[in-house]
């Protein structure tokens, strides 16, 4: 009985690894959002602004200006002459309200960046703590995975490796990498930059492909040569 209980110990450990970071991130965002909002609005901090984000804000203001003024530019003189002062005042108030709304949206973006970045740091600290304190559970989980892989046939193993490699470094993988890197890039508070994301998308698959080839050559050739033969046959 104690042996069976010990064998089942990694199950709650695995469940906590999966669900605890999500729960902490959600609770953290809900509990600290009012405080962060107050802190950001009162201090009007510019610590988290970078050049790319400033350019994005300027672009939004330019778009707002074009939205309100471009269509009216030709009729501006007639509007001033023919429109009463109250209509012109309403027009200015409308621009002022839209500008305030844009500033609020800009502040909300930065508040969410701070919350997500802080939650990511906390999740990373939790994972690190679990890795250090849960040595025994990790050993048992590792033995489970190794036993599961050992019981698979070489054909299934080769098919799984081929499927994973096609998903990660195959012909259609750049689109998935672009979505994933863009999501992580945004989640950590960096402004969207097509050049940087394109560079990462073109670099990561190449690095993974090199690591995979080294792993197949250095490790699988010694452990299971038949698996390597089946993999190359499927790949061809």
Swiss-Prot record:
Annotated TM spans: 8-28, 113-133, 161-181, 196-216
This protein's GO CC annotations: chloroplast inner membrane
One example of a Gene Ontology biological process annotation: potassium ion transport
Membrane-topology descriptor: Multi-pass membrane protein
Pfam families: CemA
Compartments, as annotated in UniProt: Plastid, Chloroplast inner membrane
Reaction it catalyzes: K(+)(in) + H(+)(out) = K(+)(out) + H(+)(in)
GO MF annotation terms: antiporter activity; proton transmembrane transporter activity
Primary localisation category: plastid
Entry keywords, A to Z: Antiport, Chloroplast, Hydrogen ion transport, Ion transport, Membrane, Plastid, Plastid inner membrane, Potassium, Potassium transport, Transmembrane, Transmembrane helix, Transport
Functional note: Contributes to K(+)/H(+) antiport activity by supporting proton efflux to control proton extrusion and homeostasis in chloroplasts in a light-dependent manner to modulate photosynthesis. Prevents excessive induction of non-photochemical quenching (NPQ) under continuous-light conditions. Indirectly promotes efficient inorganic carbon uptake into chloroplasts.
Family that this chain belongs to: Belongs to the CemA family.
HAMAP family, alphabetized: CemA_PxcA
Protein name: Potassium/proton antiporter CemA
